[in-house]
Amino acid sequence: MQRIAVMGAAGRMGKTLIEAVSQAEGATLSAAIDRADSSLIGADAGELVGLGKIGVTLAGDLAAMVDDFDVLIDFTHPSVTLKNLEVCRQAGKAMVIGTTGFTVEEKQQLSEAAKQIPIVFAANFSVGVNLCLKLLDTAARVLGDDVDIEIIEAHHRHKVDAPSGTALRMGEVVADALGRDLQKVAVYGREGQTGARERETIGFATVRAGDVVGDHTVLFAADGERVEITHKASSRMTFAKGAVRSALWLQQRSPALYDMQDVLGLR
């Protein structure tokens, strides 16, 4: 039985993760952690999500809980995740990281920690999105430099980073397939007199509105035709189930930095 801890357990995604763990065979929720100043500290994690009492109370200190879990699932904020990363590294605990918005330097910290503990880090844990990444690689290689490529994403009003981690990952996959450096060819939004579109650039457009869980479209546009690869999520549960699947997959894995493509056997 894989003992799973959920960080940010009182938040929207944290509550969904608690539900997903409760539904997963071979997994048990053994710890739930949130901010130390949360008014919900001490509450039963099961009651937070309508499951009734499960005997796991919401804690405010990850370091005090390290003996209670095998793997930590963290969908929080880069600054929080990096602190948790150090705790897990020192304790030899595996991690599943769904936090987005890391800088290049911060991602390097994940890579360094993965030399000592197994980590699954993905911008998106949806099976459908990861299938789309595979399709995007194929589409980019087939369509090549004859198309203009734009990535359009939409999320709820509360999302704090833009473009989304998933949109950026999609851009990386396309750029890698075409032998381009995304940092050099990405164009983030357009305004005013921008001039004609530069060939070989990859454009990003962002929408933040309502309660949109997550929509992503990659547009390959040529003269006379276009190909669109789209994924739309209607529930956070799809991400939560993928994260729990990753946590179970990490059992007996050697230290390394994995992603959802590894979990799904798509490599």
UniProtKB/Swiss-Prot annotation:
Keywords assigned: Amino-acid biosynthesis, Cytoplasm, Diaminopimelate biosynthesis, Lysine biosynthesis, NAD, NADP, Oxidoreductase
Keyword Ion transport tagged: no
Any one GO molecular function term: NADP binding
NADP as UniProt keyword: yes
Record pathway: Amino-acid biosynthesis; L-lysine biosynthesis via DAP pathway; (S)-tetrahydrodipicolinate from L-aspartate: step 4/4
UniProt gene name: dapB
Native organism taxonomy: Bacteria, Pseudomonadati, Pseudomonadota, Gammaproteobacteria, Pseudomonadales
Any single GO BP term: lysine biosynthetic process via diaminopimelate
Chain sites annotated for binding (S)-2,3,4,5-tetrahydrodipicolinate: 156, 165-166
Record's protein name: 4-hydroxy-tetrahydrodipicolinate reductase
Residues the record lists as binding NADP(+): 35
Primary role: Catalyzes the conversion of 4-hydroxy-tetrahydrodipicolinate (HTPA) to tetrahydrodipicolinate.
Species of provenance: Ectopseudomonas mendocina (strain ymp) (Pseudomonas mendocina)
